[in-house]
Amino acid sequence: MADKNLRFLVVDDFSTMRRIVRNLLKELGFHNVEEAEDGVDALNKLRAGGFDFVVSDWNMPNMDGLDLLKTIRTDGALATLPVLMVTAEAKKENIIAAAQAGASGYVVKPFTAATLEEKLNKIFEKLGM
């Protein structure tokens, strides 16, 4: 069972989607959730420290989710952060690109709380969280 005090950063340019993910995380018992509206905003917050998990959209202005993921994986201080991609990009090549870039998991929108919980639990299990 993962620590319910884990600090999540939800990254999406659509505020309604950020709120949906935040509320689903709260339903699952995770109340320590902050938001960022794009990859640039997210990186600034991540580099300030203290986050344990990133849930990111793919399509965003300024820096998309894939570039954010690649930047996280090449940053020594952030490289081990779990990153769950939550996106409308359902094409096989997108899923492969995310996996090759180091995504910890991938959820296609729209999704249910059960789907999110299942993906999170798989990541927690794999990382021993």
Curated annotation (Swiss-Prot):
Stored Pfam families: Response_reg
Gene3D superfamilies for the chain: 3.40.50.2300
Cofactor(s), by name: Mg(2+)
UniProt-annotated location(s): Cytoplasm
Keyword Repeat: no
Alphabetical list of NCBIfam families matching this protein: PRK10610.1 (NF007901)
Protein name as it appears in the record: Chemotaxis protein CheY
Organism: Yersinia pestis
